[in-house]
């Protein structure tokens, strides 16, 4: 059991506390000079892998991130939390902005095969695009079973038991390893990296590779036409009677 290896995908996103601003040309959002951090769902995925390692159920944790050189900061955070080594799939900034779930899934699938991992952990979604697709696509490319929105993960021999919340209650899945698991908010509460572990993380290895080295084509078939701010909410109008309300609703075409 202790020979299991886990690959954890971590994404660098604009920090959740930052107010998002759209570029003047509406081609995307402003990222230059903006604070970034690890996607919160990815933090949960890292934490779960580390907890399994602390229970001596996982031997090695590899953190991987796709994007520009700044992604190494995100990988260092994962290393400080307890991951053993990192892989940075270096993608230039302009190309990284158009990176979609399918392109990332192709990279992760190749790395999972190359590293011969037994578990692939991801956050269920990223807070920047909210796609909730990468884990499912990766499982499809690998032809591995998947447990999405995991709120509890238990290793049982050559299987992983995943408990997930659904509309009608809880669903329990048993997946034969290797498998893909995506983390939901209720799975755990990620730890803060301590200063000693942050210092140790600086000495841990981060391997830098190109997507081409993995034989992955990052060409996207999806193009962004325009990114716009949400419309401003218009001021409300007070009405005195029900008749006035009905008349006003008819006036604006609501009824």
From Swiss-Prot:
It comes from the Eukaryota. The modification N6-succinyllysine is found at residues 210, 248. Its main location: mitochondrion. The modification Phosphoserine is found at residues 223, 226. Methylated. Trimethylation at Lys-200 and Lys-203 may negatively regulate the activity in electron transfer from acyl-CoA dehydrogenases. GO terms for biological process: amino acid catabolic process; fatty acid beta-oxidation using acyl-CoA dehydrogenase; respiratory electron transport chain. Residues 183-205 are annotated as: Recognition loop. AMP binds at residues 9, 39-42, 66, 123-134. SMART domains: ETF. The keyword Membrane does not apply. One of its GO terms (cellular component) is electron transfer flavoprotein complex. Keywords: Acetylation, Electron transport, Methylation, Mitochondrion, Nucleotide-binding, Phosphoprotein, Transport. The modification N-acetylalanine is found at residue 2. The modification N6-acetyllysine is found at residues 200, 210, 238, 248. The modification N6-methyllysine is found at residue 200. The modification N6,N6,N6-trimethyllysine is found at residues 200, 203. It is found in: Mitochondrion matrix. InterPro entries: ET-Flavoprotein_bsu_CS, ETF_a/b_N, ETF_b, ETF_beta_N, Rossmann-like_a/b/a_fold. Pfam families: ETF. Belongs to the ETF beta-subunit/FixA family. Heterodimer composed of ETFA and ETFB. Identified in a complex that contains ETFA, ETFB and ETFRF1. Interacts with ACADM. Heterodimeric electron transfer flavoprotein that accepts electrons from several mitochondrial dehydrogenases, including acyl-CoA dehydrogenases, glutaryl-CoA and sarcosine dehydrogenase. It transfers the electrons to the main mitochondrial respiratory chain via ETF-ubiquinone oxidoreductase. Required for normal mitochondrial fatty acid oxidation and normal amino acid metabolism. ETFB binds an AMP molecule that probably has a purely structural role. This is Electron transfer flavoprotein subunit beta. It comes from Mus musculus.
């Amino acid at each position: 059991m202790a020979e299991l290896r886990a690959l954890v995908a971590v994404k660098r996103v604009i920090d959740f506390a930052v107010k998002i601003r759209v570029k003047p040309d509406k081609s995307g959002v402003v990222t230059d000079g903006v604070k970034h951090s690890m996607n919160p769902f990815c933090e949960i995925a890292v934490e779960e892998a580390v907890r399994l390692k602390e229970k001596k159920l996982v031997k090695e944790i590899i953190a991987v991130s796709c994007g520009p050189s700044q992604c190494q900061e995100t990988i260092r955070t994962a290393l400080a939390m307890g991951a053993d080594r990192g892989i940075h799939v270096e993608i230039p900034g302009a190309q990284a902005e158009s990176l979609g779930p399918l392109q990332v899934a192709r990279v992760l699938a190749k790395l999972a095969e190359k590293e011969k991992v037994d578990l692939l952990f991801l956050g269920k979604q990223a807070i920047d695009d909210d796609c909730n697709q990468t884990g499912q696509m990766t499982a499809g490319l690998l032809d591995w079973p998947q447990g999405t929105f995991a709120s509890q993960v238990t290793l049982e021999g050559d299987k992983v038991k995943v408990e997930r919340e659904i509309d009608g209650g809880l669903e329990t899945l048993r997946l034969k390893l290797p498998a893909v698991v995506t983390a939901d908010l209720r799975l755990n509460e990620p730890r803060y990296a301590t200063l000693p572990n942050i210092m140790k993380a600086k000495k841990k290895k981060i391997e830098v590779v190109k997507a081409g080295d993995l034989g992955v084509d990052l060409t996207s078939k999806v193009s962004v036409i325009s990114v716009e701010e949400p419309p401003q909410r218009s001021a409300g109008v007070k009405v005195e009677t029900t008749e006035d309300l009905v008349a006003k609703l008819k006036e604006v075409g609501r009824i």
